[in-house]
Amino acid sequence: METIHVDLAERSYPISIGAELFCNPAHFSSVIPAKKRVVVISNVTVAPLYAQQIIDTLNTFECQVSLLELDDGEQYKNLDTFNQILTFLLEENHSRDVTIVALGGGVVGDVVGFASACYQRGVDFIQVPTTLLSQVDSSVGGKTAINHPLGKNMVGAFYQPKAVIIDINCLKTLPEREFAAGMAEVIKYGIIIDSDFFDWLDENMEKLYALDHDALVYAISRCCQIKADVVAKDEKESGVRALLNLGHTFGHAIEAEMGYGNWLHGEAVSAGTVMAAVTAQKEGLISQQEVDRICALLKKAKLPLKAPKEMTVEAFMKHMMRDKKVLSGKLRLVLPTSIGSSEVVTGVSERVLADVIEQCKA
């Protein structure tokens, strides 16, 4: 097992990564006092697989546990689900000392985290991510949010969990399409910060898809360590943390325009990463050879390289100008400058963006 610490002074917390963690009371009792009231919030897909394991473990130190099951899908990461959680907590008369366990993928983690931030001005919560994407990205760093019809993650808060518990055995029940979507975020870390990790992924992709224990623990740990280091330097995304959004400006536009859930987040990020790399090449920031290597690794990970053919330049620009990185009306893009480095760039012309969009459509 690996343990990584997110260093945020009094709000620091551990990330535990390994197998069979749900059955080990130590991972929960270290952050949940005995006899505590706990609410496990999951979805209708994940709860039947893993909720009872966690409830049984919590019962070993006499916690009073209740379970809420949400609908499954990006389309439910909305105000209605947020309100459903708050109503459940109120109807059960939970006070500020309740602990909430977010058991599921990125949607569950985001909406449950946001509800935890808001309920009685903030209650403790633990992230228990069950998809590769949530294990390597969304569960770490305290970003919580719900979607708005006009934009993804537009309503939310920075609110850190008390712990992140990552059991790689969950990946055995994850559909391959969802696993591939998570690989988009894994590959992102290699592109923006760590060229050695990029090379390692290129050499070990088959092991990852075979769910090799050591390969998974290493890849997830490396991603979490990179993100923990970045978050410790820039929790509220005023600087270096923005680099973690490689591919997301284009990708969020795809998700919003095509309808949440039709493209998985990682699929949209993959296509968006290609668009960012092509933009960087047109701006003279990266070589065509490195763009080709990025595309080849995404393809090896069974990810889409092209944006939807039905999306117009106007549709892309409409959504991209609502991106949270826009400042003073100017679009800022995270662009790779080589494999292993990246920067935030302002001032890419609409003509270049239009060329990129047309070039990168299916």
Curated annotation (Swiss-Prot):
Its EC number is 4.2.3.4. Zn(2+) binds at E185, H248, H265. It holds the Pfam family DHQS_C. Binds 1 divalent metal cation per subunit. Can use either Co(2+) or Zn(2+). Pathway: Metabolic intermediate biosynthesis; chorismate biosynthesis; chorismate from D-erythrose 4-phosphate and phosphoenolpyruvate: step 2/7. One of its GO terms (cellular component) is cytoplasm. Gene3D superfamilies: 3.40.50.1970, Dehydroquinate synthase-like - alpha domain. NAD(+) binds at residues 72-77, 106-110, 130-131, 143, 152, 170-173. Keywords: Amino-acid biosynthesis, Aromatic amino acid biosynthesis, Cobalt, Cytoplasm, Lyase, Metal-binding, NAD, Nucleotide-binding, Zinc. SUPFAM superfamilies: Dehydroquinate synthase-like. It is an enzyme of class 4 (lyase). It catalyses: 7-phospho-2-dehydro-3-deoxy-D-arabino-heptonate = 3-dehydroquinate + phosphate. It is found in: Cytoplasm. Its cofactor is Co(2+); Zn(2+); NAD(+). GO terms for biological process: amino acid biosynthetic process; aromatic amino acid family biosynthetic process; chorismate biosynthetic process. One of its GO terms (molecular function) is metal ion binding. Catalyzes the conversion of 3-deoxy-D-arabino-heptulosonate 7-phosphate (DAHP) to dehydroquinate (DHQ). Belongs to the sugar phosphate cyclases superfamily. Dehydroquinate synthase family. This is 3-dehydroquinate synthase. It comes from Aliivibrio salmonicida (strain LFI1238) (Vibrio salmonicida (strain LFI1238)). The lineage of its organism: Bacteria, Pseudomonadati, Pseudomonadota, Gammaproteobacteria, Vibrionales.
